[in-house]
A protein has these predicted regions:
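Conserved core of the sugar-phosphate nucleotidyltransferase
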Residues: 1-69
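Conserved alpha/beta core of the MobA/IspD/sugar-nucleotide pyrophosphorylase nucleotidyltransferase superfamily
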Residues: 48-120
Length: 120
């Protein structure tokens, strides 16, 4: 299982709509392994990154992941990544410099609508 991470900007550190990821880097800011995901603005770490919600799976890994029931941590944090971590699955992480625009909140939707209007 793999995912992406990028720089966590100052205005995102306390934003509960931004999922943060902590990574054990194998090659600094290139390739690593996830060990924590959180949204809380009450928790701050110097080495937290912005989790980009894009995943890759090998077929067998996807079968295993989808067969698992939600874990206690997944339900508590409302983050599906915890299901994999609690099942001792490895989540590989690649660092990316640029992130595509995502629409996770009403504010994000308004932002994208404004971008489209300005381009027309």
């Amino acid at each position: 299982m793999g995912t992406l991470a990028t720089e966590l900007k100052n205005n995102q550190k306390n934003d509960p709509s931004v999922t943060k990821i902590r990574i054990d880097w194998i090659k600094k800011n290139t390739i690593g392994q996830a060990f924590d995901f959180f949204k809380s603005s009450k928790v701050t770490y110097d080495e937290a990154y912005h989790h980009v919600g894009i995943y890759s799976f090998r077929y067998e890994t996807l079968k295993k992941f989808t067969s698992l029931t939600p874990s206690i941590n997944e339900l508590e944090h409302k983050l599906e990544q915890w299901r994999a971590l609690d099942a001792r699955m490895t989540i590989g992480v690649n660092y990316v410099k640029d992130v595509p625009i995502s629409v996770d909140t009403k504010k994000d939707l308004i932002n994208v609508e404004n971008i489209i209007k300005n381009k027309l």
